[in-house]
Amino acid sequence: MANSRSGDSMTERIVRVLDTFTTERTMQTATEIAERTGLPSSTAHRIVGDLVTAGLLERDEEMRIRLGMRLWELALRGSSALRLRQAALPHMEQVQTVIREHTQLAVLEHEEALFLERLSHPDAGANITRIAGRLPLHASSSGLVLLAHADPALRERVLSLPLRAVSQETVTDAAVLRRLLTTIRRQGYVVAPGSIEQVSTGVAVPVRDRGEVVAALSVVLPRESAPAPAVDALLAAARGIEQDLRSGR
């Protein structure tokens, strides 16, 4: 791909355009995209036009831009995330019948926890996670499980960075976090009260595929709820997911 005067390749500029979309910002104008990418207006408009033609972006009747169905279609073809989600969903539903709060599936992606699925009871308490949303690894129960079982080099890289406090109870001391990760690996789950929201407790367990941790399965409970039933339900669900992944269901 040809480079721009700034040194960015066309691929990098396309990624910058696509990265302006978030779970909260699903519609934009081409001018807003140009401003958020820092690309020249003519360049951003041209890239947006090309992506619309290819079906990767779509325009509505008011000329606002959104992600296109073609992008979704391509993302699902042969996706390991789709296979994982399909294996996990029946077991997540079983957890929901017991817990009746929020049940979530997350994977490690670019040093963050990326949420592939979330089931929520209508009367469930507070929860900021969204499908296709991300949370810091050190500040969520799912992220803590993923970080505990991550490649040691990645784990040390995360521990060497400033650990942002999402709530007053987020673990931001690297030494304390390192000890917590060791405990998670030893006991096979984490209970993280108040790490994201003080009114909630996150409980998470690892999900393995042929021995390798590929995801975290978690629930978000009201702070006053006992975590033991959630731990039992999650561990049983994780075993079921692992069996289905092994059998190729």
Residue map of PLM features:
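N-terminal helix-turn-helix
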Residues: 1-81, 242-247
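Short amphipathic alpha-helical signal-transduction/dimerization elements
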Residues: 22, 143, 147, 151, ...
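Amphipathic alpha-helical effector-binding/dimerization core
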Residues: 63-161
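Short, basic/aromatic recognition patches
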Residues: 87-95, 158-203, 240-243
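Juxtadomain coupling helices with adjacent low-complexity linkers
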Residues: 174, 180, 187, 198, ...
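Sensor-regulatory modules in signal-transduction proteins
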Residues: 207-209
